[in-house]
Amino acid sequence: MLILLNTFAELPEAYKAFAPTVDVLPLIPLFFFLLVFVWQAAVGFK
């Protein structure tokens, strides 16, 4: 099972150049979550 997961954990050779971008992609939803608090702070948590 671990070998199967490791197979999916690595990008195919053709996509190795995009590895830095793929590493950042999971953080994008967190930025939106933080944006909600910044937005609400700007409007006074109405």
UniProtKB/Swiss-Prot annotation:
PSII is composed of 1 copy each of membrane proteins PsbA, PsbB, PsbC, PsbD, PsbE, PsbF, PsbH, PsbI, PsbJ, PsbK, PsbL, PsbM, PsbT, PsbX, PsbY, Psb30/Ycf12, peripheral proteins PsbO, CyanoQ (PsbQ), PsbU, PsbV and a large number of cofactors. It forms dimeric complexes. It is found in: Cellular thylakoid membrane. The keyword Membrane applies. Keywords: Membrane, Photosynthesis, Photosystem II, Reaction center, Thylakoid, Transmembrane, Transmembrane helix. It comes from the Bacteria. SUPFAM superfamilies: Photosystem II reaction center protein K, PsbK (SSF161037). This is Photosystem II reaction center protein K. The keyword Nucleotidyltransferase does not apply. The chain crosses the membrane at residues 25-45. InterPro entries: PSII_PsbK (IPR003687), PSII_PsbK_sf (IPR037270). Residues 1-9 form a propeptide. One of the components of the core complex of photosystem II (PSII). PSII is a light-driven water:plastoquinone oxidoreductase that uses light energy to abstract electrons from H(2)O, generating O(2) and a proton gradient subsequently used for ATP formation. It consists of a core antenna complex that captures photons, and an electron transfer chain that converts photonic excitation into a charge separation. GO terms for biological process: photosynthesis. One of its GO terms (cellular component) is photosystem II reaction center. It is a single-pass membrane protein. Pfam families: PsbK. Belongs to the PsbK family.
